[in-house]
Curated annotation (Swiss-Prot):
Keywords associated with the record: Ribonucleoprotein, Ribosomal protein
Pfam families, per the entry: Ribosomal_L17
GO biological process, one term: translation
HAMAP family membership: Ribosomal_bL17
Protein name (record): Large ribosomal subunit protein bL17
Length: 140
């Protein structure tokens, strides 16, 4: 019986799972919407909701706890300066998971996880080297 065992293993070690959720949390904070598999989205939601609650608290200890979890100073800054004040009056339920069909190739169920009342302009913002190269060619 699996009573009392929370979460999924995803065929990864503990360290790999923690790193995966840290990276996914940072990506969700940065873009405010990401596409991933449905089980990963379901396990990511409580991680991100706890981070938003830390951002709402806003004290030094909460900031250090957030840094220990997501390890990205810029995303912690956004968490405490943008997302914390945005959800100050909301008592919970900061994330929404919407099913997004099935992935071509392995038919894995996909989902979109996003913040409720998200900033639509943050989507795709600074999406890595491909977008940086495109912006450099536009400037030239």
């Amino acid at each position: 019986m699996r009573h009392g065992f929370r979460g999924r293993r995803f065929n990864r070690t503990v360290e790999h799972r923690k790193a995966m959720f840290a990276n996914m949390s940072a990506a969700l904070i940065k873009h405010e919407q990401i596409i991933t598999t449905l089980p990963k989205a379901k396990d990511l939601r409580p991680v991100v909701e706890k981070l938003i609650t830390l951002g709402k608290r806003g004290d030094l200890h909460a900031r250090r706890q957030a840094i220990a979890q997501i390890r990205d100073e810029a995303m912690v800054k956004k968490l405490f300066e943008v997302l914390g004040p945005r959800y100050q009056t909301r008592p919970g339920g900061y994330c929404r998971i919407m099913k997004a069909g099935f992935r071509y190739g392995d038919n894995a169920p996909m989902a979109v996880i996003e913040f409720v009342d998200r900033d639509v302009n943050a989507r795709g913002q600074d999406s890595g080297p491909t977008q940086a190269a495109a912006s450099q060619t536009e400037a030239a």
